A protein has these predicted regions:
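Membrane-interfacial loop-to-helix junctions in multi-pass transporters
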Residues: 22-34, 113-123, 154-162, 197
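Extracellular/periplasmic helix-exit of transmembrane alpha-helices
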Residues: 2-18, 64, 71-110, 180-184
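Terminal cytosolic tails of multi-pass membrane transporters
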Residues: 205-229, 242-282
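Loop-to-transmembrane helix boundary motifs in multi-pass membrane proteins
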Residues: 72-81, 88-99, 121, 125, ...
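Hydrophobic membrane-spanning alpha-helices of multi-pass integral membrane proteins
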Residues: 163-176, 197-206, 222-240, 257-264
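Alpha-helical transmembrane segments
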Residues: 139-157, 184-189, 205-223
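Hydrophobic alpha-helical segments and their helix-loop junctions in multi-pass secondary transporters
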Residues: 1-22, 209-219, 234-244
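Helix-loop-helix connectors at the membrane interface of multi-pass transporters/channels
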Residues: 54-78, 105-111, 136-164
């Protein structure tokens, strides 16, 4: 649809200053790092998806199936994110939508209707709505399982499962009421979600790194360790500066982020080696 409609897309070698948006100025003035990596919450890395392993992993017969189930699906989601990024770039370059972060939801509707027409636009919008609903459903199920197993809460009967679910649903309802009643509620909630989504990924990287130490794969531990350290820097720097966080000036926020990343690497390596040594003694 973007090619048929003739959406103007910019390449790396093009002039990044269009009539409607100066991309170069945005990258320098808006602190592209870490804001970009928080904004593209699921397209690059999604810690939120790791919460679904509690359910999905129980449906697999072997760990080899994890590559198709998790790794390949994240590559596919990255491809979807690239499509949306290109579509948004085309919409802004055409001047169909004002470049304003508060109008992001309206941009989605404009893209769907302009590229796919009224019927196709509705179908695409339904897809945009269904994806977070199904992800939320799976995440809440995983949360219930994790809480019940960690606190040793019996879940053998439907009544007991419903009781624990009701508590979780009540907490979610409070958050949704706030997002709906407050004028800036959704934007605030979305910022917290984006940050917490990337923060969750740190625990996934930590678990992978420790597992590799335990299973004599320490020479490959840099594969999860490097992105884990990077996103430690990103998430800590962002929350240190953000208004929803500690609102610290950028320079000390960057320093805090670097220190946190170094500490992350040190803790993971120390704990991983400790776990590996303990297993060797057994």
């Amino acid at each position: 649809g973007m090619f048929v409609k003739g959406y103007p897309l910019l390449n790396l070698w093009d002039n990044w200053q269009s009539a409607t948006f100066n991309y170069g100025e945005y990258f320098t003035a808006q602190h592209f790092i870490p804001v970009f990596f928080i904004t593209v919450a699921c397209g690059i890395l999604s810690g939120f998806h790791s919460t679904q392993t509690a359910i999905i992993s129980r449906t697999m017969k072997s760990e080899k199936q994890g590559r198709m189930t998790f790794y390949n699906m994240m590559i596919l989601e990255g491809f979807i994110a690239m499509i949306w990024a290109a579509a948004a770039m085309g919409v802004y370059n055409l001047g169909l939508q004002e470049v304003n972060a508060s109008l992001a939801t309206g941009t989605v509707g404009i893209i769907c209707r302009d590229l796919l027409g009224p019927v196709g636009g509705i179908i695409a919008l339904l897809g945009v709505i269904v994806l977070p609903i199904t992800s939320g459903d799976t995440a809440l199920r995983s949360l219930r399982l994790s809480v019940s197993e960690s606190l040793h809460i019996d879940q053998s009967s439907k009544a007991k499962r419903l009781g624990l679910s009701a508590i979780i649903f009540a907490l979610v309802a409070v958050i949704l009421v706030f997002a709906k009643s407050s004028p800036s509620g959704f934007n605030t909630l979305w910022r917290y979600f984006a940050w917490s989504n990337q923060t969750l990924s740190l625990f996934a990287f930590l678990g992978i790194s420790v597992w590799m130490f335990e299973n004599s794969k320490a020479k490959w531990v840099w594969i999860p360790l490097i992105p884990g350290a990077w996103y430690t820097f990103v998430t800590v720097t962002f929350i240190a500066n953000a208004q929803i966080g500690f609102h610290i000036p950028w320079t000390p926020a960057y320093i805090i982020g670097v220190c946190a990343a170094v500490a992350y690497v040190g803790i993971v390596v120390w704990y991983g080696k400790k776990r590996a040594a303990r297993l060797q003694k057994l």
